[in-house]
């Protein structure tokens, strides 16, 4: 009997390790400062107004102090360059990182993109913030007519650096013509769908009640 229980605990421990499971995080109260580092998808390109961008929608749902750090056209290099000042100015409790799409569109080396995102995670953690990494699909002209998939580097980064990951949210939105303003940007409905995926993940993690 003891051996069977030991074996069961061993299996559960292994599964936790493989899935990066951990004790649920503490819920973040209203007015918590949350920085979202990103590109045009975070800025809200394709939305009918700034109020229908996903950072604005997230603020409405959480009452957090959301800092929209999205700049259209930014690559991971450019976002990384902006990050230290953003961290110093806003001192966020949580940093959400959603970057890489422009790197893929410009065919920049994946190794550089991964290194930049890894450094963005490290800088955020060094500032005392927790991190949520958002997986981004490898956008190509071929993907625009099919269903894009998350680039594998995001799962690798989340595992290596032990941060929480939101998977498939952008891929699902950009893979549905009804949710897109154009092949690489969401429309109002798409940003709403993405926000729903994001808030669900935040609840799973424990940051949002």
Predicted regions and their residues:
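Sec-dependent bacterial lipoprotein signal peptides
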Residues: 1-19
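N-terminal processing/targeting junctions
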Residues: 14-18, 24, 200
């Amino acid at each position: 009997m003891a051996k069977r229980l030991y074996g069961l605990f061993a299996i559960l421990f292994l599964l936790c390790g493989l899935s990066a499971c951990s004790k649920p995080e503490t819920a973040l109260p209203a007015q918590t400062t949350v920085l979202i580092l990103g590109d045009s998808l975070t800025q809200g390109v394709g939305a009918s107004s700034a109020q229908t961008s996903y950072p604005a929608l997230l603020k409405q749902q959480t009452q957090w102090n959301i800092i929209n750090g999205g700049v259209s056209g930014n690559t991971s290099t450019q976002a990384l360059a902006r990050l230290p000042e953003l961290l110093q100015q806003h001192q966020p409790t949580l940093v959400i990182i959603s970057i890489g799409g422009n790197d893929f569109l410009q065919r920049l080396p994946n190794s550089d993109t991964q290194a930049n995102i890894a450094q963005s995670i490290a800088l955020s953690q060094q500032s005392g913030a927790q991190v949520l990494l958002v997986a981004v699909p490898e956008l190509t002209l071929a993907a625009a007519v099919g269903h894009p998939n998350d680039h594998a580097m995001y799962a690798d980064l989340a595992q290596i650096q032990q941060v929480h990951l939101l998977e498939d949210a952008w891929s699902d939105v950009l893979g549905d013509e009804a949710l897109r303003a154009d092949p690489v940007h969401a429309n109002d409905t798409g940003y709403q769908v993405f926000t729903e995926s994001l808030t669900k993940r935040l609840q799973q993690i424990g940051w949002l009640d």
